[in-house]
Swiss-Prot record, chains A, B:
CDD domains reported in the protein's UniProt record: TrmY-like (cd18087)
Protein name: tRNA (pseudouridine(54)-N(1))-methyltransferase
Documented EC number(s): 2.1.1.257
Matches recorded under InterPro entries: Alpha/beta_knot_MTases (IPR029028), TrmY (IPR007158), tRNA_m1G_MTases_N (IPR029026)
Amino acid sequence: MRQFIVIGHDVPTDPDAVSLADLPGAGRLDVLCRCLNSAFFLSHDLRDNVRVWLVVGDEYAIRFEGSELRRLNPDERSTAALVRGALAAREKAIGSMAANPSPGVYIRTQSLSGLLESVADDGPLVTLHEDGQPVVDIDPSAEPTFVLSDHHSFDDAETALLAAHADRRVSLGPEPLHADHAITVAHNYLDTDGYNRY
Amino acid sequence: MRQFIVIGHDVPTDPDAVSLADLPGAGRLDVLCRCLNSAFFLSHDLRDNVRVWLVVGDEYAIRFEGSELRRLNPDERSTAALVRGALAAREKAIGSMAANPSPGVYIRTQSLSGLLESVADDGPLVTLHEDGQPVVDIDPSAEPTFVLSDHHSFDDAETALLAAHADRRVSLGPEPLHADHAITVAHNYLDTDGYNRY
């Protein structure tokens, strides 16, 4: 299982504040939609060994389960509708119980801190950083959990949390990448067993 | 200069047939918009050494010039508006003269065949194919022109044209990728000098 945690700093938790005609205006929800696209889509197929967590407002964690997803389409607008549908179900998420508004989509009340603790035993936690270890020095057989940020850098509190939880800081290359592009590169590294299998 | 040619088989040449509220319905224009995003965006920067050609209906070639672009944003909807604006200028493209509806965006009357001839001297022409040579066996110092297709495979006529023009068939990995993801992987290969520079 490959996992990607993407932090959305500015996306509103109120679905009524999300206009599908202006995703950049909805706290750059377009960025998170492209991350979902990169995480799940293959040509004419979905990756079923992938789980994505969107952390919205450090208050809700929306989980997308590749093996269960049925209504994900590649375009940003329809993906945003799925996220908005999850936010609309947020009041049904009570305590640690998640709501499940559509197949493969779950929302629960959870901060980044709680989420990092809950995935701690799943596999190595990896953050991406320009000064990190080159990805080619990392064992591709591990099933990592990557933590990425939207259009903002990690803030101080997140940086401290990640310093406490992350097993590795990794560099994917000399150019700073958008989060969705980073997901694509990470997948390719793992797909090819570290650029050895084509 | 890195170049990407992306063939849009179903995108209408009439801008009035493009609704920004339904990009998948506009011949999967969403796919081409994501290709532009992958080709040009770095985190907080644009790649100025990149040129993208969208071939629409085998009738028009829309050129995006990284060093000149001013109004490209990452989200699909605003990118689609730029493409629609180019299509709206198509009647000003007369003979081999291109129209230039916005900074860095040009449209001219040209088929795929003519375009492949016009870029023949720019660098090696590369197509992506699951049975192609692993990308890691390719010299990353070349400045290639990649040819990709939208959600459809290359048709028979395109396949014949590419067989005549392409210098290499390359595989980026064992999983079949969307065109925009393939562009991201190709960039990363070149950025890292063949996975050697981080």
